[in-house]
Regions:
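Flexible beta-alpha connector loops of hexameric P-loop NTPases
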Residues: 82-92, 119, 148-151
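Hydrophobic packing within well-folded, soluble alpha/beta domains
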Residues: 43, 112-113, 187
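Canonical P-loop GTPase G-domain recognition
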Residues: 7-19, 149-196
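Conserved amphipathic alpha-helical interaction elements at protein-protein interfaces in regulatory
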Residues: 49-53, 105, 135, 193
Length: 196
């Protein structure tokens, strides 16, 4: 395998409603997780250099299954967004169970990309996710999304505050924007480091 991933080869593989349906890992995997409407699908599309490979919706909570994509023998896993209030409690519980079951399963967790909106302080669910990843010693990074909505000064201030609140080392935090492409090369570098 080369020292970089050819993202132009990205394709949709499958969608799963239950973890038990997912085949065993056969290649490196990068999992993307974050609150509903954090910009997960947009960041993945920017990574792949595609507009609509990962379905983007203006309706939060649209992704309700675990979706697998593949590029150059690396799997990219789009997990359902957590914490969307306008879904029923049963649906929110199903998603929480689905995400929990996924991370409890025996898989190739080469890298977990936890996405947090840079404009807001991390929610309790964001804290819970980071605590879980840290407590279980996952290799993870935090992607701060929607950086284009803030000035550079505001970005730096918010990034510093979020790092402190989440207790995450500076080198594990990347400021990103799906609009401008900020941070995408760094994200690709971290993925290659973890998977190749």
């Amino acid at each position: 395998m080369a020292d970089s991933i050819n993202y132009q080869l990205a394709k949709f593989v499958a969608s799963y409603g239950k973890v038990s349906q997912i085949p065993e890992s056969t290649c490196p995997e990068v999992s993307f997780v974050g609150r509903s409407n954090v910009g997960k699908s947009s960041i993945m599309n920017k990574l792949f250099g595609r507009k609509n490979l990962v379905k983007v919706s203006s309706t939060p909570g649209k992704t309700s299954n675990i979706n697998f994509f593949e590029a150059d023998d690396v799997h990219f896993v789009d997990l359902p967004g957590y914490g969307f209030a306008r879904r029923s409690k049963a649906e929110r519980d199903r998603w929480a169970d689905l995400i929990g079951d996924f991370f409890d399963s025996e898989r190739s967790f080469n890298l977990v990309v936890s996405l947090v909106d840079i404009r807001h302080d991390p929610s309790k669910l964001d804290h819970d996710m980071i605590d879980y990843l840290q407590g279980n010693e996952f290799n993870f990074i935090v992607c701060l999304t929607k950086a284009d909505k803030l000035s550079r000064t505001q970005q730096a201030r918010q990034a510093a505050a979020i790092k402190k609140q989440l207790n995450v080392p500076a080198e594990n935090v990347i400021i990103t924007s799906s609009q401008t492409g900020t941070g995408i090369d760094e994200l690709k570098r971290r993925i290659a480091e973890a998977c190749l």
